[in-house]
C-alpha cells in the first residue's frame, strides 16, 4: 500500500472547499492515514520547497504557502502517488482536465489548490517533514 503527501493550499482552504477535495480522494480509493491543519512558517515553507530555491517563482511560492492555513494529509492506497496526481490535474488549472481538482477549484498556476508528491521517494521525505510515524495510522 503506497502513501503520498497531499497539501490543500491556502487558496482552497480560504474558499471552503477542503471537504469537497477530501471527498475526491476518498471516493477514488485514497484513504486518509493522517491529517492536520496548520499555518506554515516562512522557515518551514522555505525548507519544504528548497528544491525550488533557484527557480524564479520560489519567493512567491513561499509567500503564498504562508498566506493562510493549509491542510496536510497522508493519503494511502494502491498507486497512491500516481492516483493523487491524476486527481489533482495539471499544475496550470487552464491545462487541467475537466473534473480534476485543479480544473474545478484552482484559481491560477500559483494558487492551484493542492500539492502532491511527485514520486514515492519524495513522498517519504515529504511525509516525514510533516508527520511523526506515530501520527500515521
Swiss-Prot record:
Required cofactor names: Mg(2+)
A biological process from GO: GTP biosynthetic process
Transferase is among the record's keywords: yes
Pfam families referenced in this protein's UniProt entry, alphabetically: NDK (PF00334)
SUPFAM superfamilies on file: Nucleoside diphosphate kinase, NDK
Principal location class: cytoplasm
Keywords assigned: ATP-binding, Cytoplasm, Kinase, Magnesium, Metal-binding, Nucleotide metabolism, Nucleotide-binding, Phosphoprotein, Transferase
Catalytic activity entry: a 2'-deoxyribonucleoside 5'-diphosphate + ATP = a 2'-deoxyribonucleoside 5'-triphosphate + ADP; a ribonucleoside 5'-diphosphate + ATP = a ribonucleoside 5'-triphosphate + ADP
Transmembrane helix among keywords: no
Subcellular location: Cytoplasm
Record GO terms (molecular function): ATP binding; metal ion binding; nucleoside diphosphate kinase activity
Residues given in the record as ATP binding sites: 9, 57, 85, 91, 102, 112
Enzyme class: transferase
Matches recorded under NCBIfam families: PRK00668.1
Function comment: Major role in the synthesis of nucleoside triphosphates other than ATP. The ATP gamma phosphate is transferred to the NDP beta phosphate via a ping-pong mechanism, using a phosphorylated active-site intermediate.
Name this protein carries in UniProt: Nucleoside diphosphate kinase
UniProt organism field: Campylobacter fetus subsp. fetus (strain 82-40)
Name of encoding gene: ndk
Amino acid at each position: 500500500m503506497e502513501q503520498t503527501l497531499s497539501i490543500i493550499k491556502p487558496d482552497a482552504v480560504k474558499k471552503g472547499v477542503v471537504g469537497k477535495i477530501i471527498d475526491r480522494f476518498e471516493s477514488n480509493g485514497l484513504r486518509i492515514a493522517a491529517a492536520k491543519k496548520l499555518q506554515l512558517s516562512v522557515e518551514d515553507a522555505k525548507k519544504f520547497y528548497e528544491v525550488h530555491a533557484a527557480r524564479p517563482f520560489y519567493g512567491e511560492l513561499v509567500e503564498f504557502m504562508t498566506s493562510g492555513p493549509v491542510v496536510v494529509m497522508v493519503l494511502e492506497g494502491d498507486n497512491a502517488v500516481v492516483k493523487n496526481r491524476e486527481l489533482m490535474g495539471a499544475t496550470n488549472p487552464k491545462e487541467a482536465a475537466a473534473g480534476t481538482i485543479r480544473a474545478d477549484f484552482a484559481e491560477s498556476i500559483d494558487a492551484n489548490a493542492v500539492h502532491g508528491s511527485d514520486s514515492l521517494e519524495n513522498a517519504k521525505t515529504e511525509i516525514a517533514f510533516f508527520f511523526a510515524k506515530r501520527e500515521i495510522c
